[in-house]
Curated annotation (Swiss-Prot):
Originating gene: dnaE2
Protein's GO biological process: DNA repair; DNA replication
The reaction(s) this protein catalyses: DNA(n) + a 2'-deoxyribonucleoside 5'-triphosphate = DNA(n+1) + diphosphate
Region of interest called Disordered, as start-end residue ranges on this chain: 1-51
CDD domains: DnaE_OBF (cd04485)
Predominant location: cytoplasm
Descriptive protein name: Error-prone DNA polymerase
EC number: 2.7.7.7
This protein's UniProt keywords: Cytoplasm, DNA damage, DNA repair, DNA replication, DNA-directed DNA polymerase, Nucleotidyltransferase, Transferase
Localization annotation: Cytoplasm
Main EC class the enzyme belongs to: transferase
């Protein structure tokens, strides 16, 4: 067994878990195998490159990484690696207007023993860096002299970004910068945009002298150095000599830098292309503006000494200044702020008070639930020992706010392993009853704060985020960034733009790149230089986004730790670091995640109460109701949370869920880990009695009994260590972590010996048995899914399935209200509701709300006005408010006189049939739209269109369907394929509803609109297509060979004819495609493509 060479491949996992012998010549682990993708950035791994070293001491004090966003062509890690290879004694990271790459820079430097200097190049101009090829305004290069200098710099960066009022336009106050420095910064005169060099270029030596005098007056001579750079420009030598001549006059030092924008010369062409993208020009059109970058790479001390042989003291001074400014980033680690507790309480005592009150509600008095109270005492002791009570109080406060404001929320993930979280009402899963291990969530050996994810109704999450801002203050709370990186399509498009190709070519070539692989499916016609540059820029940062839910709360102004800037969304401020950066530096993060299904469930509850008079309490639903499980076993799960995907619908008939824990297993089975770990088929075979339930050793039975001897959950690995080898729960968590994605050779060696010793002592097991068990544990460690997470989600599976079964109209309307969410488009959701007997009506200005609702005692659905093209939610709300306040609209002129609507908006309402309440056909309403919209009371008489409506024929069924789809995206009472059914029948095309009667292995011809294309990372190149006709849905499997033969058609066609072989031996129906053809629909359809 190897301990440090990564997780096993898919095939190897199946072999291990099934106890099969290894094939000759196959290694235990295949580093290039099909491994799971982690959402977390792994620990930095140095590349092991040979170091050339240097006999001349030198520190690079001016370097831009890719986190200067299109002004640097290497990652911070690549800069550090090259600095280590060259033997530099220190390296400064000085990205534009931020510390975006500081954590990555620090992590790499710590591994490679490179001293770090933190700084930034401030853009003092008033315009954004991306608005023109060469934005006006000077730059100021600031180096922090130690942690205090870092804090002051971070604060000033944040102040400038927030003062700018919008993303990407920092506004600095030069006097405020002067005051903030306080001797804790060192100022370099900068490159060509620096105050002094720019003054020299524009006004000659006298102007340069004045600019330098200003810097010295502001920051003192001991804190200013003249910067000499050489990028190969013809005037570099002359300008450097002039600048060096100013130094004695002002008593300032001289330092040499490379002004690096990339690590090594090979990235020079990419740097120029990125500069052109930043300028929104092609390389040719921006050539006159782009600064020469040929020499803007890191250099060794020897090379710098040769380049500045005429001024060797500049190279020496750079090394000395680097040593003086260098420090480690861990020195700025923050903490959580103290929580405001009632008088007479500490955080620990107040947490205990809240937990015990909640426990009495959840479990009753202590005598009735001794196990639960014992577990709570244990958890409170650990929380106090780790000094985390404040964290739990903050989370409780957030969930309390949600409950007080009627916002559905629930904690998930490993937090559901905690009885304290359950008692506080943070989670909905009882960990005591479900025998979950608390140490999976929190243990004394943990090296960071706990991680609690809170799912919140998507449509209400903004209220919760603003509550956190309000409670803690914008200075102490911010959202976590999400770094948007280049992927295949965006890389091809931007590189083609930089090279001057037309927008049409850019778009066409980018579409040749696969959604799934990021590689070009067909490189024919794409110029080699575009592919080369696109390959280089892939995975480099393009811009900063906002994390889906991460918020940081800090015990000091958060800008002391990391700069904050405005996000694109209103009233959102965002850190310059992502979630992994925050975790690495010790910032405490809370994940407030929007979950569309919680919004849908809330809407469904409200609709049922409003239209049927039934109050639904989700917590009191009968989780054993057979009818719900029977519906799911038929794979009747369109719209149902977590089990509506193609893979889940294929598994449900095989699993045949009968009890709640079956849903827990179903949620966990179709995940990358269990799929790659080979757990799916063994579990289903055992569940259906095909294979026997066997255990490698009797001690494994308690941990694996619930999953029939097949490991699915991470908690099972820990329980196996407890049961087999006598580990404590905390030791078991250490084993899980040591075996996980961040494998530790030393810890693995120690814990392996502990496991063997424990199993020998407890059970007298021979080494060959222990070998097999340990091998399975190690193989499984990377693939297990958290049982606590599956339990949390399984509740939502049941709740949503219950609504679909008992209140299908309310369920459909709720899903439409909560869009965008889920796996299916509104058209598919409406078609499914219709197949379940629900009548769906189009929008109507006198009957619709702004969003979808129910009618006829909750048995029918009415589409909302907000779904009509050009209207939007805000205008739809105004229209409904006017109708509510002043009565129904009596005519089209009455409507347009009371609500201001444009001609396109009235035409869209007419096309959608929303004006039918006025006794007008759609064509008549369209004819009258222009006159009505332009004939408002604020218009002069006679200037509008004619209001006379001639006799017009009505629309055909096909035209009505096309009008519906154009206006709302949904055809409420038809499906595009029904208009082709006669032709399809003549061709021998089988409707979806009849596939259940086809024998396994028979060949059929099917047709339908493509609703999804999906190629999971776990599927080894297989692509799944979902077709839908007016009778139902069909899952289609495309092997890599079939996909390759029909790639362009399969990838782009909105509807397909497919001939293939039926597979239904297991109860789940799939058609394995053999040939494909285009199907032309008279009414449009769109697909959703997933990884």
């Amino acid at each position: 067994m190897g301990w440090s060479n990564g997780p096993p491949s898919w095939a190897e996992m199946e072999r291990v878990l099934n106890g099969k012998p290894r094939h000759a010549g196959v290694p235990a682990f295949d580093a290039d195998g099909d491994v799971p993708r982690s959402r977390k950035r792994g620990a930095y791994q140095p590349p092991g490159r040979e170091r050339v070293g240097s006999s001349v001491a030198y520190a690079e004090l001016h370097a831009h990484s890719a986190y200067s966003f299109l002004d640097g062509a290497s990652t911070p890690e690549e800069l550090v690696e090259e600095a280590a290879r060259l033997g530099l004694c220190a390296l400064a990271l000085t990205d534009h207007d931020g510390l975006y790459g500081a954590v990555r820079f620090a992590e790499a430097a710590a591994e490679l023993d490179v001293r770090t200097v933190f700084g930034a190049e401030l853009s003092l101009g008033a315009t954004a860096r991306t608005e023109r090829p060469d934005p006006p305004g000077p730059h100021l290069l600031v180096l922090a002299r130690g942690p205090e200098g870092y804090r002051r710099l971070s604060r000033q960066l944040a102040a400038a970004h927030l003062a700018g009022g919008e993303k990407g336009k920092p506004r600095y106050d030069f006097d405020a910068l002067t005051e903030a420095a306080g001797g804790h910064w060192h100022i370099l005169t900068g490159c060509r945009k620096g105050h002094v060099r720019q003054a020299l270029s524009q006004g000659g030596p006298a102007a340069a002298q004045r600019a330098l005098a200003d810097l010295v007056d502001r920051f003192t001579p001991s804190r200013v150095s003249i910067e000499l750079t050489h990028h190969g420009h013809p005037l570099d030598d002359e300008r450097n000599a002039a600048l060096a001549g100013l130094a004695p006059r002002f008593g300032v030092g001289i330092v040499a830098t490379t002004g690096a924008h990339f690590a090594d010369p090979s990235r020079g062409r990419l740097a120029m292309a990125m500069a052109a993208i930043r300028a929104r020009r092609s390389l040719d059109s921006a050539a006159g503006w782009l600064a020469p970058l040929g020499g803007a790479h890191l250099r060794s001390g020897e090379e710098m000494a040769r380049l500045f042989a005429w001024c060797p003291e500049a190279v020496t001074a750079a090394a000395e200044l680097g040593e003086r400014c260098a420090f480690g980033l861990q020195l700025i680690a923050p903490r959580l702020p103290p929580f405001d507790v009632p008088d007479g309480h500490t955080e620990d005592s107040w947490l205990r008070s809240l937990v015990m009150a909640g426990a009495r509600e959840r479990y009753g008095p202590p005598k009735s639930a001794p196990r639960a109270y014992s577990q709570i005492e244990h958890e409170l002791k650990v929380i106090a020992q780790l000094r985390f009570p404040g964290y739990f109080l903050v989370v409780h406060d957030i969930t309390r706010f949600c409950r007080d404001n009627d916002i559905l929320c629930q904690g998930r993930g490993s937090a559901a392993n905690s009885a304290v979280c359950y008692a506080l009402g943070v989670t909905a899963v009882d960990p005591v009853a479900n025998e979950l291990l608390f140490e999976r969530f929190l243990s004394p050996a943990r090296d960071g704060p706990p991680d609690i994810d809170i799912d919140i109704e998507s449509d209400q999450r903004e209220k919760v985020i603003q509550y956190v801002y309000h409670k803690y203050g914008r200075d102490y709370a911010a959202q976590v960034a999400n770094v948007i990186t280049y992927r295949g399509r965006s890389a091809v498009r931007d590189m083609a733009r930089a090279l001057g190709f037309s927008p049409g070519q850019q778009d066409a070539w980018s579409k040749q790149v696969s959604h799934w692989t990021g590689q070009a499916d067909d490189v024919d016609g794409i110029p080699e230089q575009v592919i080369d540059l696109a390959t280089q820029i892939r995975n480099l940062p393009r811009h900063l986004g906002i994390h889906s839910g991460g918020m940081v709360i800090c015990d000091r102004p958060i800008a002391d730790v990391c700069p904050v800037e405005w996000a694109r969304m209103a009233n959102r401020s965002v850190l310059q670091w992502d979630k992994d950066d925050c975790a690495a530096i010790g910032l405490v993060k809370f994940d407030l995640l929007g979950l569309g299904m919680l919004s849908a469930l809330h809407y469904a509850k409200d609709l049922v109460a409003e239209h049927k008079g039934i109050e639904v309490d989700l917590a009191r639903l009968d989780l054993s109701e057979p009818a719900v499980y029977e519906m799911l076993a038929r794979a009747d799960s369109v719209g149902v949370f977590q089990v509506e995907s193609r893979a889940q619908m294929a598994t449900l008939p095989r699993l045949k869920p009968r009890v709640f824990y079956d849903l827990v297993v179903e949620v966990a089975l179709i995940r990358p880990g269990p799929i790659q770990g080979g757990s799916v088929h063994p579990y289903i075979r055992r569940r259906n009695g095909v294979d026997p339930v066997i255990y490698e050793h009797p001690s494994m039975a308690p941990a694996l009994r619930k999953t029939l001897g097949v490991p699915l959950f991470q908690e099972q690995l820990m329980q196996l260590a407890v049961d087999c080898a006598g580990f404590s729960a905390a030791e078991a968590d250490q084993l899980r972590r040591a075996m996980g994605s961040k494998r530790s050779t030393e810890r693995m060696r120690r814990l392996r010996g502990r496991f063997y010793d424990g199993m020998r002592a407890l059970h007298g097991a021979p080494d060959e048995v222990i070998d097999r068990i340990y091998e399975k544990l190690e193989a499984f460690a990377n693939f297990g899914f958290p049982e606590s997470h599956a339990l949390s989600f399984a509740s939502l599976v049941f709740y949503s399935a219950w609504f679909k079964l008992h209140h299908p109209a309310a369920f459909c309307a709720a899903l439409l209200r909560a869009q965008p969410m889920g796996f299916y488009s509104p058209q598919s959701l409406v078609a499914d509701a219709r197949r379940h007997g629900v009548a769906v009506h189009g929008p109507c200005v006198n009957a619709s709300l702004a969003h979808a609702t129910c009618e006829n005692a909750g048995t029918e659905v009415r589409l909302g006005l907000g779904a009509v093209r050009y209207l939007g939610a805000e205008l739809a709300e105004k229209l409904v408010a006017e109708r509510t306040a002043n009565g129904p609209f009596t005519s089209l002129p009455d409507l347009t006189s009371r609500v201001q609507l444009s001609v396109p908006q009235v035409e869209a309402l007419a096309t959608a049939g929303a004006l039918g309440c006025f006794g007008m056909s759609r064509r008549e309403a369209l004819w009258a739209a222009g006159a009505a919209a332009t004939g408002r009371p604020d218009r002069l008489p006679g200037v509008g269109s004619s209001s006379h409506i001639p006799a017009l024929p009505g629309m055909s069924e096909l035209e009505l369907a096309a009008a519906d789809v154009w206006a709302t995206g949904v055809s409420p009472d038809s499906y595009p394929t029904q208009f082709l059914r006669a032709d399809l029948d003549a061709m021998g095309v089988l409707p979806a509803e009849r596939l259940g009667s086809v024998s396994d292995g028979d060949r059929v011809l099917i047709a339908g609109a493509v609703t999804h294309r999906q190629r999971p990372a776990t599927a080894q190149g297989v692509t799944f297509i979902n077709l839908e006709d007016e009778t139902g849905m069909v899952n289609v499997l495309c092997t890599p060979g079939v996909w390759a033969r029909h790639r362009k058609l399969a990838h782009t066609a909105p509807a397909l004819l497919i001939r293939g072989q039926v597979q239904n031996a297991s109860g789940a129906i799939t058609v394995v495609a053999e040939r494909m053809g285009r199907l032309t629909l008279a009414v449009g359809a769109r697909s959703r493509d997933f990884r």
